[in-house]
């Protein structure tokens, strides 16, 4: 069913002021396409070229028309031009170059007609019959210094928007941060607050500068006749007096200081400072800071510190009367009536702000506990307090303690805790005044250990007394920001305790309002209610979602005060919430899921009834995405409801919440108490939904909060869809009333609480996952990276064998041997002799990261050395001829064959599991395939099965001593890798057990970019079907070479397993261990196998610890990648635990057979397994899987 935007509107009556502009007449508009050769990505350059064209040919070839140009491809004129297509040539002088002969550049401009556009659609739109999008711009004006090398550009924002009275010009003051156009030396001095520039920069300072200047454009000034521009990509780790580079093809090398003196006769003053680097790491350009100047007009997009935020807010934070006056002055200054483009297109702008009617909604009556002196409360101007009031449901805190990382004295911390406890008890909570352990201070440099120590001591003490666990940890933060995210992550992710963070500047001098807010937060964290709204409305409030895919939903009725939140990871900058409803495939049935479905189930469990109406407050949607978001998310809501019960489709109201807009409302008369609050802003509850709103769609502006400083910004609520058929009064009153039950403070908030809570959930998830900071009132508002090591460090990626790649933070002086030692310790692997690969080459272990010129996220591969040693050992490991090993396989349960790195370029799918008797046949097929690959890639030497050996300690095959394999890696030739080989083997593996049609279906299910060389597999499949197949995989070499040219375009690795059923087609090496464990959970087996899965020994096999790639700290555990070691260890530990009286050897072995049969489809369900008992047992037994799975 198609969705249409809601078309209802409301009506209001009290005066509020806005800004209006009208269009006097409607003209015929002609659109032309512009192409400029040579092309330029800069709009400014394109505009200069076109302005030059208008100067030269405006009155002649252009017929006196003044065209409007967008700086790209489109040009508009008010009326026709004398031509339909014309080419012009103009010459433009580059003002940056002083040699005008070289600076003059010729441009060819082609203008051709694209179509005629009249303004009939605009008329229809303004009459409410058509929908369109506004055009917006931001104009910059005055500037102001905000510190640390940055400046604030103050200007104004303007957008032409449709309203019920015609076109409206919306103007507002705007400000943003830019780099100051100063020399890089000056920027560094301000940014680092350096006084003595003769001293060299520390590594800590160098890292800070690199982060601040990366991507910034600079221009050089050491050549008088030429100015060149570069983009900064990094900073050199050593000073330019020591930085040596080749200056010619003869190998001549000089330092940067020497080069500038010899080439430009320029003596560098800051020789102890590093150079800026431009270009790539392979071809760097070194630029001394003192000859570089930051190009003007570059926006600073990184996070500002507290001081800079304060300075930039001062530029725009103005009282309503001052802001209105400033906007009016801007309108007069811009002289819209004299604008030549406005005159050309017949637009007239009124200079006066226009009065529009509005109304003020009454605040709701709030309900508190009957035990308090005041049982109800009527907010005054959007605010109230907790004096003589008790929370509706006061929480209980019996076990708590406090930990301080600040410089507050112990007696100050104890006094704050006492005041907070007194406030909690006074407002209706039950708070034990005695902590579990004494309040203490701790070293801020060791936050994680301090938290773990407090948790350990309190848990031990409470366990002895039988009092449960720690219920609340009060934490006094550092004076400097940066610790909040780490504390939340450790407390909630690792330790599982509730924490309340407080800023030392508030805790040292707490006032009653602050203590009330903290008490309310603690009560909410104990899942209790602080107050209720006495409402006559029946629809339950539903959830909201922020741009980071956090969704919250109300869980009580009819109070609507308790909310539950869910967070879902999704694509970067994805505005649609992808996980509202999901469908999973199970071998037995279809499994429905998603956040909306979970909320509906939780609501029913909590209240005993299903939701009869849903109100969806949706945040984080831009206007251009309204239709797309509505269609996708309404469909998800309907599917989630229908999945619970057939025919269950509650009516939904879909409301988009927007705070980031530039509409401001001013009182009609400034200073009147009946029209303004204390800050001079409009009264809380002011709502506007006429005249300045959309001519057809249902939306309104609501200012639900009282202003604190500056001019209040009303929240824009856009009703996209309304099946509940709300009137404007009903939805506006409901939204306003909800703003009074935000659980963390005693005043009305500016945004409806579900939207607020979704932002909190999203930011909290970032804190717990990445250690980011939060903007809470009792916690810090920002966080900066802290460089812990004075020595320069670099994050690299290391892969050992086939374990998962892990990030390691190493010093630049670290050698390859240091990398090996740390990586092996991380994986708990012991290897005696290894190769270290950097890129595609083996490196010496003595080489350092600095000498290798490694950059961030460089990848290193550590593999056992497979050649050398005596005849019966390789790399210290015992080896036996592969033919002898094949003969010894017999009827063994399974065998693991590992593909050595010599045979795989990419390292994908590097080993196979081979079960039972087919092992010999499969290895023979492997050798046949290697012959095909040999022919395709032109090995330096041929080999046979006699050249291969088996290493029982590693469970892998390798080439014996003296066999050398070389790949042809020329780019112009297509090269097969062992990912292809392993995939082909797996195809043959399945082919031997299934129908050929299933194999072909699995291959052709691949989508572009999902697999590699599908044509090669097709060739192989055709060859499998050929009559010669009985003698092995003797491929048609001519046919193969004939199709080789088509294979060169394939780039990704072949992966035939991603789109297949995990229960049936799970292949070792093609998916992670986590999916395997999930598959185990789906297998219907007796419950006794879980004991082994949860044992400490098994957990060491299942998981490995990994480090945070940003902080380098131990962050948690992750499933191991499948490796030969973990598989063998898994089987050994599994059988060991099964034999501890839980099952017989026969059952344990059979269960292992069942598990492996779900990984590699080797056996049918009723196939009889062969069980090989220990030596002490006399005879073998045979049994079927059904016997083991029989519950009886």
UniProtKB/Swiss-Prot annotation:
Pfam family, any one: ArgoN
Gene Ontology terms, MF aspect: RNA binding; RNA endonuclease activity
PAZ domain sequence ranges: 183-296
Function comment: Probably involved in the RNA silencing pathway. May bind to short RNAs such as microRNAs (miRNAs) or short interfering RNAs (siRNAs), and represses the translation of mRNAs which are complementary to them.
Keywords: RNA-mediated gene silencing
PANTHER family found in the cross-reference section: EUKARYOTIC TRANSLATION INITIATION FACTOR 2C (PTHR22891)
Domain Piwi, first and last residues per copy: 472-770
GO cellular component, as recorded: cytoplasm; nucleus
Organism (species): Oryza sativa subsp. japonica (Rice)
One annotated GO biological process: regulatory ncRNA-mediated gene silencing
Domain of life: Eukaryota
UniProt family annotation: Belongs to the argonaute family. Ago subfamily.
Entry protein name: Protein argonaute 13
């Amino acid at each position: 069913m198609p969705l249409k935007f809601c078309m209802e509107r409301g009506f209001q009556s009290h005066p509020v002021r806005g800004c209006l502009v009208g269009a006097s007449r409607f003209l015929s508009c002609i659109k032309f396409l512009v192409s400029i050769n040579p092309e330029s990505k800069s709009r400014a350059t394109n505009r200069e070229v076109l302005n030059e064209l208008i100067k030269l040919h405006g009155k002649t070839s252009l017929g006196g028309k003044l065209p409007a140009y967008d700086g790209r491809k489109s040009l508009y004129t008010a009326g026709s031009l004398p031509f339909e297509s014309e080419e012009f040539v103009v010459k433009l002088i580059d003002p940056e170059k002083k040699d005008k002969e070289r600076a003059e550049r010729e441009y060819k401009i082609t203008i051709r007609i694209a179509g005629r556009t009249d303004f009939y659609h605009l008329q229809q739109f303004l009459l409410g019959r058509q929908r369109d999008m506004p055009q917006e711009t931001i104009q910059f004006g005055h500037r102001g210094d905000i510190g640390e090398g940055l400046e604030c550009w103050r200007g104004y924002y303007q957008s032409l928007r449709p309203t019920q009275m015609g076109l409206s010009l919306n103007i507002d003051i705007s400000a943003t941060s830019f780099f100051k156009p100063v020399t890089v030396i000056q920027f560094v001095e301000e940014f680092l607050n350096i006084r003595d520039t003769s001293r060299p920069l520390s590594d800590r300072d160098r890292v800070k500068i690199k982060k601040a200047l990366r991507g910034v454009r600079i221009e050089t000034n050491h050549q008088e006749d030429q100015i060149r521009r570069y983009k900064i990509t990094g900073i050199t780790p050593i000073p330019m007096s020591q930085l040596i580079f080749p200056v010619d093809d003869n190998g001549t090398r000089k330092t940067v200081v020497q080069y500038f003196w010899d080439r430009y006769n320029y003596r560098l003053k800051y020789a102890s400072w590093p150079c800026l680097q431009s270009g790539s790491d392979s071809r760097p350009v070194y630029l001394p800071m003192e000859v570089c100047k930051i190009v003007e007009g570059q926006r600073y997009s990184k996070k500002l510190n507290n001081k800079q935020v304060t300075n930039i807010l001062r530029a725009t934070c103005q009282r309503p009367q001052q802001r209105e006056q400033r906007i009016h002055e801007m309108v007069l200054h811009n002289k819209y009536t004299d604008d030549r483009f406005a005159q050309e297109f017949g637009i007239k702008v009124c200079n006066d702000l226009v009065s529009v009617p509005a109304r003020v909604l009454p605040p709701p009556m709030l309900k508190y506990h009957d035990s308090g002196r005041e049982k109800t409360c009527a907010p005054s101007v959007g605010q109230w307090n907790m004096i003589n009031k008790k929370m509706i449901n006061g929480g209980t805190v019996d076990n708590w303690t406090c930990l301080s990382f600040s410089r507050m004295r112990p007696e100050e911390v104890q006094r704050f805790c006492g005041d907070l406890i007194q406030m909690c008890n006074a407002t209706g909570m039950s708070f034990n005044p005695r902590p579990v352990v004494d309040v203490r201070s701790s070293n801020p440099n060791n936050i994680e250990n301090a938290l773990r120590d407090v948790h350990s001591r309190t848990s031990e003490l409470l366990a002895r007394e039988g009092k449960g666990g720690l219920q609340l940890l009060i934490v006094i933060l550092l004076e400097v920001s940066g610790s909040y995210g780490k504390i939340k992550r450790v407390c909630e992710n690792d330790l599982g305790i509730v924490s309340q963070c407080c800023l030392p500047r508030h805790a040292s001098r707490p006032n009653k309002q602050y203590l009330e807010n903290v008490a309310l937060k603690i009560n909410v964290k104990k899942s209790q209610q602080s107050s209720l709204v006495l409402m006559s409305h029946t629809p339950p409030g539903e959830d909201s979602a922020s741009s980071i895919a956090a969704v919250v939903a109300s869980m009580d009725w009819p109070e609507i005060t308790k909310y539950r939140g869910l967070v879902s990871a999704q694509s970067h900058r994805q505005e649609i919430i992808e996980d509202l409803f999901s469908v999973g495939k199970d071998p037995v049935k279809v499994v429905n899921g998603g956040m909306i479905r979970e909320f509906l189930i939780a609501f029913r469990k909590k209240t005993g009834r299903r939701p009869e109406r849903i109100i969806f407050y949706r945040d984080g949607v831009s206007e251009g995405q309204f239709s797309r978001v509505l269609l996708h998310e309404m469909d998800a809501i309907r599917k989630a409801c229908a999945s619970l019960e057939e025919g269950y489709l509650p009516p939904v109201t879909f409301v988009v919440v927007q705070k980031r807009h530039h509409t401001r409302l001013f009182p009609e008369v400034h200073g009147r108490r009946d029209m303004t609050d204390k800050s001079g802003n409009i009264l809380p509850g002011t709502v506007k939904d006429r005249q300045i709103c959309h001519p057809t769609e249902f939306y309104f502006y609501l200012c639900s909060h009282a202003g604190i400083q500056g001019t209040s910004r009303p929240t824009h609520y856009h009703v996209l869809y309304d099946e509940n058929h709300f009137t404007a009064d009903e939805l506006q009153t409901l939204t306003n009333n909800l703003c009074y039950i935000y659980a963390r403070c005693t005043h009305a908030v500016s945004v409806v609480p579900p939207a607020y809570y979704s932002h909190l959930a999203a930011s909290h998830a970032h804190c717990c996952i990445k250690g980011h900071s939060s903007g809470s009132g009792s916690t810090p508002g920002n966080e900066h990276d802290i460089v812990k090591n004075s020595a320069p460090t670099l994050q690299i990626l290391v892969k050992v064998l086939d374990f998962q790649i892990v990030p390691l933070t190493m010093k630049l002086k670290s050698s390859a041997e240091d990398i090996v030692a740390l990586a092996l310790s991380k994986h708990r692997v012991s290897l005696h002799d290894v190769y270290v690969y950097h890129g595609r080459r083996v490196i010496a272990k003595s080489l350092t990261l600095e000498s290798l010129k490694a950059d961030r996220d460089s990848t290193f591969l550590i593999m056992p050395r497979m050649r050398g040693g005596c005849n019966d050992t390789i790399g210290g490991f015992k080896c036996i001829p592969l033919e002898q090993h094949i003969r010894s396989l017999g009827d063994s349960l399974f065998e693991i064959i590992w593909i050595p790195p010599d045979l795989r370029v990419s390292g994908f799918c590097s080993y196979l599991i081979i079960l039972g008797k087919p092992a010999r046949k499969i290895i023979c097929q492997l050798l046949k395939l290697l012959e095909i690959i040999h022919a395709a890639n032109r090995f330096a030497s041929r080999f046979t099965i006699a050249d291969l050996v088996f290493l029982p300690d590693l469970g892998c095959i390798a080439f014996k001593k003296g066999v050398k394999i070389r790949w042809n890696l020329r780019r112009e030739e297509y090269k097969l890798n062992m990912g292809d080989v392993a995939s082909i083997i797996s195809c043959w593996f399945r082919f031997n057990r299934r129908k050929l049609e299933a194999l072909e279906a699995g291959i052709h299910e691949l989508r572009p970019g999902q697999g590699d060389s599908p044509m090669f597999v097709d060739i192989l499949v055709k060859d499998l079907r050929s009559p010669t197949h009985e003698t092995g995989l003797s491929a048609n070499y001519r046919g193969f070479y004939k199709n080789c040219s088509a294979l060169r375009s394939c780039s990704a690795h072949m992966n035939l397993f991603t789109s297949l059923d995990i229960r049936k087609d799970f292949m070792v090496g093609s998916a992670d261990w986590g999916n395997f464990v999930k598959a185990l959970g789906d297998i219907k087996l007796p419950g006794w196998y879980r004991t082994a899965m949860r044992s400490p020994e098994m957990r060491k096999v299942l998981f490995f610890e990994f480090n945070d790639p940003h902080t380098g700290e131990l962050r948690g555990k992750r499933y191991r990648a499948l490796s030969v070691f973990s598989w063998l260890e898994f089987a050994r530990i599994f059988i060991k635990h099964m034999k501890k009286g839980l099952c017989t050897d026969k059952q344990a072995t059979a269960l292992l057979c069942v598990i492996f049969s779900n990984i590699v489809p080797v056996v049918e369900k009723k196939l009889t397994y062969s069980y090989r008992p220990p030596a002490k047992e006399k005879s073998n037994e045979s049994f079927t899987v059904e016997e083991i799975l029989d519950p009886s």
